[in-house]
Amino acid sequence: MEEIEGTNRAAVESCHRVLNLLHRSQQQDHVGFEKNLVSETREAVIRFKRVGSLLSSSVGHARFRRAKKLQSHVSQSLLLDPCQQRTTEVPSSSSQKTPVLRSGFQELSLRQPSDSLTLGTRSFSLNSNAKAPLLQLNQQTMPPSNYPTLFPVQQQQQQQQQQQQQEQQQQQQQQQQQFHERLQAHHLHQQQQLQKHQAELMLRKCNGGISLSFDNSSCTPTMSSTRSFVSSLSIDGSVANIEGKNSFHFGVPSSTDQNSLHSKRKCPLKGDEHGSLKCGSSSRCHCAKKRKHRVRRSIRVPAISNKVADIPPDDYSWRKYGQKPIKGSPYPRGYYKCSSMRGCPARKHVERCLEDPAMLIVTYEAEHNHPKLPSQAITT
């Protein structure tokens, strides 16, 4: 059994060498390639014959029985190259035995009487009696037009697959086109809604009572009120009555007029002269909010203890209302306001000096609106 396996392995290796030579046929010399191919092919045939003889011999209880040759309805002439049929004549006798070796992509046919080798679309004829082996190589391939006649089922399957792919592509294109159309309609609807909303806002503003009509050098706002009296107001304060219209004419004022205008301009939300309504109480007020300028002065005084709450006393009473940590300093900053008199705007904040922790930095803001009260007790 081991002998049969070794002989079979050697025969398969010889067949692989023949296939490698055929694969590298274009890279080698023509004369040397023919000699190597003939010798390797002969060796492969001999080894396969040796395998057949070992299997046919009766060794032990195992016997090798040749199967009857199945008659195929397809003639072998259809599987061969048409050019090969014209050049090579295949003997048809019942006494000839043709063992066939098939690989994954090629068909190898070995015939004993004539020692001929047919491999795919290439045919080789070997003659051992001649002085030099003869090699007939036919490299002509079957034209693509003959393939559909041999495989009609595969052709139909390919056509069906192509039709399915085309239908899928058409469906995808239609879906994409519908999606783009819906997206464009949505954008158009949003734009229309936005324009409608803006038109409503403009209409509300116009119905509020002010409409501006611009000319080259004058701006004429008109009041849409039936009970409004007819007057005309200029920059210098003079009032003139005009029949039929209520208009305010603004010319280009000089620098002195601008200063007087800014000084006399009042907020309409302030109310009466006594200030019953504060200017900043309404969100519709457009008065300029000026930040109060606070005078600050800082002094350094020695600390009276290591506690943060202990601050050196002065002429006023102070109440602590906040504390905040300082970035980069382990000591916080304390905030105090004057408690000597109610409503005093004076403030101060105390922090420990980073260079000298025994000193305190006291910063005063604003001024006291009351005299000093030395008799009061100082509280922190």
UniProtKB/Swiss-Prot annotation:
Cellular component aspect of the GO annotation: nucleus
Residue spans of biased composition, Low complexity class: 154-178
Region (Disordered): 84-107, 139-196
Subcellular location field: Nucleus
Keywords: DNA-binding, Nucleus, Transcription, Transcription regulation
Any matching Pfam family: Plant_zn_clust
GO MF annotation list: calmodulin binding; DNA-binding transcription factor activity; transcription cis-regulatory region binding
Induction text: By salicylic acid.
Domain of life, per lineage: Eukaryota
DNA-binding region per Swiss-Prot/TrEMBL record: 307-373
Entry coiled-coil feature ranges: none
Similarity-based family: Belongs to the WRKY group II-d family.
Protein name: Probable WRKY transcription factor 21
Organism whose genome encodes this protein: Arabidopsis thaliana
